[in-house]
């Protein structure tokens, strides 16, 4: 199967019941080892279909607008468009990308908090009217360049975790909302609703209680100025687990019934990103170099094997200047699986994993316990579908990993039963039975 990079058509291997993700990875590890190719992704599109089904079951009252910057792989966007999601776009390129798939402007929101004038004009030109705003300067830019804009006031929430104030960078205070409503009235900018965002790192779901209460206050304020409010955007913040989705729904559902009841004419939307794609993609990387170091050279507080055995530093053919770019702004807590088979009683050694750049920032895993690996061995990282597909840096001649798409026959039939057909709604897809055949000896390895 051809690896997708920017192909016009996406080849998707259909897997029978006897073939699983591990078999697919084994197949491409073998191929890439023979050809000396780079790291690669395997994308299970069936998981995206399942996530959408889960969303419709748990939070059917909330329409998802997928956050495009999370994973803008065209195949992902096309299958989500076929499923009927909206799209939250942060740039001109993202708006153009989803409109090329036939997505109507009414199903696109321009969510960038800091918009270039040229991009506001582009949104006006292509009919993308709904956008977010949290300050007076942005309101004035919108007023001058998009006469048909419909604005969601972005309000701040109280989800600062561990001293991190990332969410306070964007979003106005409740106190400042009246001033912004006054400005919008003077500028003749149409305010149609409110947006807030609660970080996925937030475990205090009481934050949603405060945010929804504040949103209701803004709706009431806006009514005083004569604005017709008809949309509430509760942002992203969904990790992808069914438990978290149910927990959030348990908190917000009764509040939505109170503050924004059904029949009130208010559409409830959200901007899930990693929820849809994180678990759908697996990354395979190759060990290209290794060093043996003394165990006590590792910094204090990191995982050690508690012995006098040596520790190992491994360098991989992908790093923060490629698929692990999000590691620069957030902690990556995942520990990879070792692809090769090893004995259960094989000793484990303190290990550190680095990208290929030799940059001190290019550390992927500070410390973990792994069996001794050799140059040419492969490591498997799960849940790599979010924030992993940006343009790679030209540093060290990095190349974007190939993507191999798959879907089980059962997921494919489920998709057909839902009325999503490749000939009518997913015209760029080519579905074909996979021909992967592996011996028992080549089967997927156990976890490290």
UniProtKB/Swiss-Prot annotation:
Sorted UniProt keywords: Nucleus, Polyamine biosynthesis, Ubl conjugation
Broad class of where this protein is predominantly found: nucleus
A GO molecular-function annotation: catalytic activity
GO CC annotation terms, alphabetical: nucleus
Post-translational modification: Ubiquitinated, leading to its proteasomal degradation; a process that is reduced in presence of antizyme OAZ1.
Domain of life, per lineage: Eukaryota
Annotated positions for site Not modified: 69
PROSITE patterns: ODR_DC_2_2
Compartments (UniProt record): Nucleus
Tissue distribution: Expressed during testis development.
Gene3D superfamilies: Alanine racemase (3.20.20.10), Lyase, Ornithine Decarboxylase, Chain A, domain 1 (2.40.37.10)
One GO process term, biological-process aspect: positive regulation of polyamine transmembrane transport
Disulphide linkage map: none
Subunit structure: Monomer. Interacts with OAZ1 and OAZ3; this interaction disrupts the interaction between the antizyme and ODC1.
Cited function: Antizyme inhibitor (AZI) protein that positively regulates ornithine decarboxylase (ODC) activity and polyamine uptake. AZI is an enzymatically inactive ODC homolog that counteracts the negative effect of ODC antizymes (AZs) OAZ1, OAZ2 and OAZ3 on ODC activity by competing with ODC for antizyme-binding. Inhibits antizyme-dependent ODC degradation and releases ODC monomers from their inactive complex with antizymes, leading to formation of the catalytically active ODC homodimer and restoring polyamine production.
Family according to the record: Belongs to the Orn/Lys/Arg decarboxylase class-II family. ODC antizyme inhibitor subfamily.
Protein name: Antizyme inhibitor 1
Originating organism: Mus musculus
Lineage: Eukaryota, Metazoa, Chordata, Craniata, Vertebrata
Gene coding for it: Azin1
């Amino acid at each position: 199967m051809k690896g997708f990079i920017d192909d016009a058509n996406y080849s998707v291997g259909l897997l029978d019941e006897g073939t699983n993700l591990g078999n697919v990875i084994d197949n491409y590890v073998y191929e890439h080892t023979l050809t000396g190719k780079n790291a690669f992704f395997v994308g299970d599109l069936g998981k995206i279909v399942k996530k959408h089904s889960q969303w419709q079951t748990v939070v059917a009252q909330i329409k998802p607008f997928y956050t495009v910057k999370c994973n803008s792989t065209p195949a992902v966007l096309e299958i989500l468009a076929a499923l009927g999601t909206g799209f939250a776009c942060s740039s001109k390129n993202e708006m153009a990308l989803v409109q090329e798939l036939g997505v109507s402007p009414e199903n696109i929101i321009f969510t960038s908090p800091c918009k270039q004038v040229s991009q506001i004009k582009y949104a006006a030109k292509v009919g993308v009217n709904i956008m977010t705003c949290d300050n007076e300067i942005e309101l004035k830019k919108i007023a001058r360049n998009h006469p048909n804009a419909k604005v969601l006031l972005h309000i701040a929430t109280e989800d600062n975790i561990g001293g991190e104030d990332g969410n306070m960078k964007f979003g106005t205070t409740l106190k400042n909302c009246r001033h912004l409503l006054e400005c919008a009235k003077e500028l003749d900018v149409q305010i149609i609703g409110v947006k807030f965002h609660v970080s996925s790192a937030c475990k205090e779901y009481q934050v949603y209680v405060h945010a929804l209460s504040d949103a209701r206050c803004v709706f009431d304020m806006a009514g005083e100025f004569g604005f017709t409010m008809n949309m509430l955007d509760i942002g992203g913040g969904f990790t992808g687990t069914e438990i978290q989705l149910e927990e959030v729904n348990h908190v917000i559902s009764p509040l939505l019934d109170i503050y924004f009841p059904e029949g009130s004419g208010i559409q409830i939307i959200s901007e899930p990103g990693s929820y849809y794609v994180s678990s759908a993609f697996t990354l395979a990387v190759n060990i290209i170099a290794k060093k043996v170091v003394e165990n006590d050279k590792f910094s204090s507080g990191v995982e050690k094997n508690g012995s006098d055995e040596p520790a190992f530093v491994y360098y991989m053919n992908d790093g923060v200047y490629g698929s692990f770019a999000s590691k620069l702004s957030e902690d990556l807590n995942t520990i990879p699986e070792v692809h090769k088979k090893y004995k259960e009683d094989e000793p484990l050694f303190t290990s550190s994993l680095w990208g290929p750049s030799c940059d001190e920032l290019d550390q992927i895993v500070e410390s973990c316990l792994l069996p001794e690996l050799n140059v040419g061995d492969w490591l498997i990282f799960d849940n790599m579908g979010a924030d992993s597909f940006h343009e790679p840096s030209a540093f060290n001649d990095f190349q974007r990993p190939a993507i191999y798409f798959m879907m089980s026959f059962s997921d494919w039939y489920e998709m057909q039963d839902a009325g999503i057909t490749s000939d009518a709604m997913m015209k760029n897809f080519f579905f074909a039975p996979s021909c992967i055949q592996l011996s028992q000896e080549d089967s997927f390895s156990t976890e490290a």
